[in-house]
Amino acid sequence: MAYYYSEPSHTFSEYLLVPGYTSPDCIPANVSLRTPLVKFRKGQEESPLSLNIPLVSAIMQSVSNDTLAVALAKEGGISFIYGSQSVEDEAAMVARVKSYKAGFVPSDSNLSPDATMQDVLDLKKRTGHSTVAITSDGTSQGKLLGIVTSRDYRVSRMDPATKVSTFMTPFERLITAPEGTTLKEANDIIWDHKLNSLPIVSADGRLLYFVFRKDYEQHKENPAELLDSQKRYMVGAGINTKDYEKRVPALVEAGADVLCIDSSEGYSCWQEQTLRFIRERYGDSVKVGAGNVVDRDGFRFLAEAGADFVKVGIGGGSICITRETKGIGRGQATALIEVAAARDEYFAETGIYVPICSDGGIVHDYHMTLALAMGADFIMLGRYFARFDESPTNRVLVNGQYMKEYWGEGSNRARNWQRYDLGGGTGLAFEEGVDSYVTYAGPLKENVAKSLYKVKSTMCNCGVTNIPNLQKNAKITLVSATSIVEGGYHDVVLKAHGNSQH
């Protein structure tokens, strides 16, 4: 006989947080939103990979490309580059994110002394970089002979065939730093000598890295930015359960910090096989999340299969119609509460803490705080990020209002059959997502800052200044339908102006 749940499943909108005691220290400026991204053992100080803010962007064509990944990493979160594209294109997006943040940056713009000004212009157009290293063999491993920047030539006054050796700044006139120079030392040299870039060279004169002034300035503007050990922006990437043997190595080679199996339903042998392949080939060196699941059994299955984090949620996304088309899913709040309990049980039994990601169901900013209070370590958002300048879709004018295009990975437009495949050879038989618009909201930075200030303020109302204490001490109440109505404006006539809901 089928199993019947005795209680209905609930959404975030059916809950509220009850205030706790607010001490003098409970102010937004004192709140830390740092949170684990991947699993760790009891006794470790923290997770091998952590987020500075509990927000990650969804594995979607209309959300997570390299531009949004850089913008989110600057704020302290991470993007998962969408996998519904060729292996080569996804790896290239990852590589662009890793090369964007310049702590110690390997040079990807190199020419030999015999190259011409036209070669410089072509390379600049291809890479977007204006600093070109001139090396003995034209590669990043060659002996550094000089540097060309846009100040060394004038297109309107020079023959495109002019050799770079005639207008480059030669090595003997360059200010360089030796191998082993720290980032602080490099930045001090840049400031003392008023440089835009500083080459780091080996004892035998080979170019190792560049350090750029612009990255120091960006760091000052973005103190929470999420960086790896080489001071590069961190980025994740989505994979599927079909071509993982080819895709995973390419993404690892490109520098992806973490992977995530992208599927509408993760309690399957296909995810187990994908996790097994990664563990057998890479051990624990490659971090990979799995999902999505909505109950204790699903979490346990993926945790035991080796997942570094588990995503929770089926059918709760704004463009997802899995519940409508297949009758599969669960209210996001109920799913999250059960999986969080399973996560804590697993930790008590094994000493291994497997973070959980709440994916879907976020409509208002306060839902973020509720999700964290209910046990989520971080939150995956699609529609939220799709509204911003940095998302990859077009901004269009619809009925006098600016909108951004937004479509689901289960839609016919995405044609991402790998995400919804059950192991057969057929393609997309029916859609589990829609093609739509979302209201344009402007730049990511100011919107994320506004949302997170609300989260921090609510945490202070609950009497806590970090996420673990919120999960431990929050008081959450289920509310009636009339309580929900009472919580909004009522019995007044609004003046005609825009509202701030997203």
Residue locations for each model-derived region?
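Alpha/beta catalytic cores of nucleotide-metabolism and tRNA/nucleoside-modifying enzymes
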Residues: 1-21, 109-112, 177-178, 184-188, ...
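Bateman/CBS regulatory modules and CBS-like beta-alpha motifs in cytosolic regions of diverse proteins
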Residues: 27-51, 58-60, 89-129, 134-137, ...
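Surface-exposed amphipathic alpha-helices with a cationic face
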Residues: 44-48, 73, 98, 121-125, ...
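Short beta-strand/loop segments at the ligand-binding rim of alpha/beta enzyme cores
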Residues: 48-57, 103-108, 228-237, 278-294, ...
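Catalytic cores of alpha/beta
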Residues: 67-70, 244-254, 288, 294-312, ...
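Glycine-rich phosphate-binding active-site loops on the catalytic face of alpha/beta enzymes
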Residues: 74-89, 256-268, 308-326, 362-395
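Catalytic beta/alpha-barrel core
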Residues: 80-85, 109-111, 131-135, 176-178, ...
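Active-site-adjacent beta->alpha loops and helix N-cap segments on the catalytic face
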Residues: 85-95, 141, 156-161, 206-226, ...
